[in-house]
């Protein structure tokens, strides 16, 4: 799967280079490209890969890290040239509706992306519907990621619609994984907002909780 993802992204980078042909020049005469990224594992990997490949072709590349909303605002304003981690058609639909007239989709880096609530495999429940009866084991909380992330917005809706009697705790992608790792080391129950592709699924034995209401929707594309 890693090889496939890299091949797809190399083809996208060729598209980037064609698009960036008219980018502004830096003081040394090299074309400048600005890549926005959020602290999500797959986006970091793709952005740094693009940086290396573009620099090998003579571009000056600046990586700009921000939360998801400022990234879209910066793209619409022309301050960021590309963002490689947009989840469509659902998760980032609000941003596309708001800024889409100023944006252009170049291609798909990953198909069948998924998001939802994730637990270690030793947790015995299978479904979101079972969370409430075991909420004390989960300390009455769901460990989330960045405020404003599409996954967080979707999870807030999941909590309302089921409903779920646990509180969504914002953090960051890295902090969420740190909480997950500590709980696994101690064989404690934990539920987090998770998604694939993400390296944590290859490092830890995890599972998505079933979503019988399909609140998180179908597979998406990045």
Model-derived regions: residue spans:
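Bacterial signal peptide processing site
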Residues: 24-26
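Short helix-initiation/N-cap motifs at beta->coil->alpha
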Residues: 40-41, 62-74, 168-179
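Pocket-flanking alpha-helical
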Residues: 47, 67-101, 178-179, 199-205
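Short, well-ordered beta-strand elements
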Residues: 29-42, 59-64, 139-143
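Ligand-binding cleft/hinge of the Venus flytrap
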Residues: 50-58, 133-169
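C-terminal motif of bacterial Sec signal peptides marking the signal peptidase cleavage site
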Residues: 18-22
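Periplasmic-binding protein-like
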Residues: 108-116, 174, 200-222
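A conserved helix-loop-strand patch within extracytoplasmic ligand-binding domains
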Residues: 101-148
């Amino acid at each position: 799967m890693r090889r496939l993802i890299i091949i797809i992204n190399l083809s996208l980078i060729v598209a980037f280079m064609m698009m960036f042909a008219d980018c502004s020049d830096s003081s040394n005469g090299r074309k400048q490209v600005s890549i926005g990224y959020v602290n999500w594992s797959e986006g970091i990997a793709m952005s740094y890969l693009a940086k290396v490949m573009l620099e090998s072709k003579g571009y000056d590349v600046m990586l700009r890290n921000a939360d998801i909303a400022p990234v879209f605002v910066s793209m619409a304003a022309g301050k960021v040239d590309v963002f490689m981690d947009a989840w469509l058609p659902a998760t980032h639909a609000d941003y596309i509706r708001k800024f889409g007239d100023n944006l252009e989709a170049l291609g798909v880096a990953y198909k069948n992306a998924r998001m939802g609530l994730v637990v270690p495999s030793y947790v015995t429940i299978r479904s979101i519907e079972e969370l409430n009866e075991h909420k004390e084991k989960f300390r009455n909380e769901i460990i989330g990621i960045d405020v404003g992330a599409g996954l967080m917005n979707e999870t807030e809706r999941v909590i309302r619609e089921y409903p779920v009697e646990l509180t969504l705790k914002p953090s960051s992608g890295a902090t969420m994984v740190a909480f997950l790792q500590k709980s696994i080391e101690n064989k404690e129950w934990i539920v987090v907002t998770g998604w694939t592709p993400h390296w944590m699924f290859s490092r830890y034995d995890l599972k998505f909780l079933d979503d019988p209401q399909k609140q998180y929707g179908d597979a998406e594309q990045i």
